[in-house]
Curated annotation (Swiss-Prot):
The chain crosses the membrane at residues 9-28, 43-62, 69-86, 115-137. It comes from Oceanobacillus iheyensis (strain DSM 14371 / CIP 107618 / JCM 11309 / KCTC 3954 / HTE831). This is Probable disulfide formation protein. Belongs to the DsbB family. BdbC subfamily. The gene is bdbC. One of its GO terms (cellular component) is plasma membrane.
Length: 145
């Protein structure tokens, strides 16, 4: 285990904050606003929620190697979010999006801030931030070696 630089520690904490905010945001929309998550939303939650624990433990232990699964989960989450966003906003994908097996079709748009920011967009940005910051930590640690 390599000791993290102060910059890497701060980035790791920032990743944890981002994952926590994404978790809190998704719970706000489902529990406070009563928006029922669709099937693709559940997949994104399955990929995001553990990141709070993974990066939290990594930050406490100051060991980025513990968080390696988070890199893969955030990358996969970014792909799922991108697909979900396309299902909501691109006509070719919208026809497919209604085929979600849950009680809520995946092409339902609960929020649409500024005409393009939907829940999958916000999730995708969160996954992207986590993924990029994790790569920056790995790069920072590589420089230190």
């Amino acid at each position: 285990m390599k000791k993290l630089t102060k910059k890497a520690e701060n980035l790791l904490l920032l990743i944890w904050v981002q994952a926590f905010l994404a978790l809190a945001g998704s719970l706000f929309y489902s529990e406070v606003m009563n928006y029922v998550p669709c099937e693709l939303c559940w997949y994104q939650r399955i990929l995001m929620y553990p990141l709070v624990l993974i990066y939290g433990v990594a930050a406490i232990k100051k060991d980025i190697s513990f968080a390696l699964p988070g890199l893969f989960m955030s990358g996969i989450g970014l792909l799922v979010s991108t697909y979900h966003y396309l299902v909501q906003h691109v006509s070719i994908f919208q026809e497919v999006g209604g085929a979600c097996s849950g009680s809520v079709p995946c092409n339902v748009i609960y929020v649409n801030y500024f005409g393009f920011i939907s829940i999958p967009f916000m999730a995708g940005v969160a996954f992207l931030i986590i993924f990029v910051l994790h790569l920056l930590i790995l790069r920072e640690q590589g420089r230190k070696a």
